[in-house]
């Protein structure tokens, strides 16, 4: 069953362009990360930025939540987190601070 996820994160001021650039470079610099997301059935993945506040809104659909959650233990993911950490609010393990949002409406 496909699960729809919505999350809020924060990118630090003055790093908006760099945040976007690093995501554009993900398929080339971090192909293992892209592969892991695809293998977990992640699709329809988008991240939006509110440049007034630095708030990021991520939306994605995941076909296998167990595989998706396991990505956090992969070296490729930890390297990605370390690469992105200077730009964002992060936890001690360098993972981004995220807030999961409950879905309150959906229209197919």
UniProtKB/Swiss-Prot annotation:
Residues holding substrate: 19, 45, 80-81
A GO-annotated cellular component: cytoplasm
Reaction catalyzed: alpha-L-rhamnose = beta-L-rhamnose
Family per similarity comment: Belongs to the rhamnose mutarotase family.
Top enzyme class: isomerase
Active site residues of this protein: 23 (proton donor)
Top-rank taxon, per record: Bacteria
Annotated function: Involved in the anomeric conversion of L-rhamnose.
Biochemical pathway: Carbohydrate metabolism; L-rhamnose metabolism
Any Pfam family: rhaM
Stored SUPFAM superfamilies: Dimeric alpha+beta barrel
First-listed, main subcellular location of the protein, grouped into a coarse class: cytoplasm
Keyword Plastid assigned: no
Intracellular or extracellular location(s): Cytoplasm
Aminoacyl-tRNA synthetase among keywords: no
Complex and partners: Homodimer.
UniProt-listed GO biological process terms: rhamnose catabolic process
Name recorded for this polypeptide: L-rhamnose mutarotase
GO MF annotations in UniProt: L-rhamnose mutarotase activity
